[in-house]
């Protein structure tokens, strides 16, 4: 299973805040803390605040955990320029059965101060294998209204095929499919548009012995065009980015190296993750991510602070 470190968690959550997509419904992976001073304590909540280059807050998120380290609530926050503070916006509630995520419910207040449920996602399994993911909107009466679903096929204990369907005005159509391949120690994920013969995107993952991504190759394709200038169902590679990720002893990202090529031109950069101001439990309270690019001055990409609360089992 793919794991996400503390630093990457902060980046993903902040990205979800800036563009609320359906992918943001998956719960953020909890941080990987060092060995706690007491086996009876756990992280109960964590607040992540992002800042601009003037050190003014831009967004925030508060994550609540259960005693198993699973995220049970994600409260998003935005910066109110009039109040000059972070205020709550939408939030998600996560439900589990054992180690498996079974339901996500999304709530939004629309500036009214009164939250209402606006969406939900359910997950169905056979043993440890995810078989179906269903997305719902909420109608005017508060009932679940199906808007699409994903079906997964497994072969030999591995994911093989995913098909995504959308539902509109009672009609169900195939909108996208994915194929999963396993070659040269990599897990390969190919995305296909409906009816396409070749992929529109390809991700190749290599993991370490702890299940963490240490190499990711992302390949983007664009469709071929016929003699009349119309797109066909075949795609050609137009760009490739390879990311090499390193981790510190805590299990958080310490460095990410990128190489990018497109149109015969190549470039590269390196992101360095600096954690500081450890609290009494050994968890960092500050993160700065700096990007170094040959021929350019270093650039600060991310400035975040973390605040934790702890609870006893």
Where on the chain are the PLM-derived regions?
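C-terminal motif of bacterial Sec signal peptides marking the signal peptidase cleavage site
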Residues: 16-19
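Buried hydrophobic residues that stabilize the cores of well-folded domains
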Residues: 24-313
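Sec-dependent N-terminal signal peptides
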Residues: 6-14
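Positively charged n-region of N-terminal signal peptides that target proteins for export
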Residues: 1-5
């Amino acid at each position: 299973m793919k794991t996400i470190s503390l630093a990457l968690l902060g980046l993903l959550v902040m990205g979800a805040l800036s563009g609320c997509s359906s992918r943001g419904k998956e719960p953020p992976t909890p941080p990987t803390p060092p060995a706690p001073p007491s086996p009876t304590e756990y992280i109960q909540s964590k607040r992540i605040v992002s800042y601009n280059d003037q050190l003014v807050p831009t967004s925030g998120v508060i994550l609540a955990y259960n005693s198993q380290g699973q995220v049970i609530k994600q409260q998003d926050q935005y910066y109110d320029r009039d109040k000059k503070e972070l205020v709550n916006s939408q939030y998600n509630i996560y439900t589990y059965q054992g180690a498996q995520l079974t339901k996500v419910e999304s709530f939004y207040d629309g500036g009214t101060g009164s939250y209402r449920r606006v969406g939900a996602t359910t997950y169905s399994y056979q043993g440890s294998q995810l078989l179906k993911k269903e997305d719902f909107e909420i109608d005017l009466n508060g009932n679940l209204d199906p808007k699409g679903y994903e079906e997964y096929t497994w072969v030999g204990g591995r994911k093989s095929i995913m098909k995504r369907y959308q539902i509109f005005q009672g009609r169900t159509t195939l909108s996208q499919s994915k194929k999963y391949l396993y070659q040269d120690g990599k897990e390969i994920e190919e995305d296909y548009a409906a009816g396409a013969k070749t992929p529109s995107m390809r991700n190749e993952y290599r993991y370490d012995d702890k299940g963490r991504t240490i190499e990711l190759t992302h390949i983007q394709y664009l469709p071929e065009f016929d003699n009349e200038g119309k797109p066909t169902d075949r795609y050609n590679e137009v760009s490739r980015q390879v990311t090499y990720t390193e981790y510190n002893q805590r299990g958080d990202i310490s460095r990410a190296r990128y190489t990018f090529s497109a149109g015969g031109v190549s470039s590269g950069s390196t992101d360095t993750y600096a954690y500081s101001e450890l609290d009494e439990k050994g968890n960092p309270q500050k993160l700065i991510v700096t990007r170094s690019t040959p021929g350019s001055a270093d650039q600060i990409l991310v400035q975040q602070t973390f605040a934790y609360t702890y609870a006893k089992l």
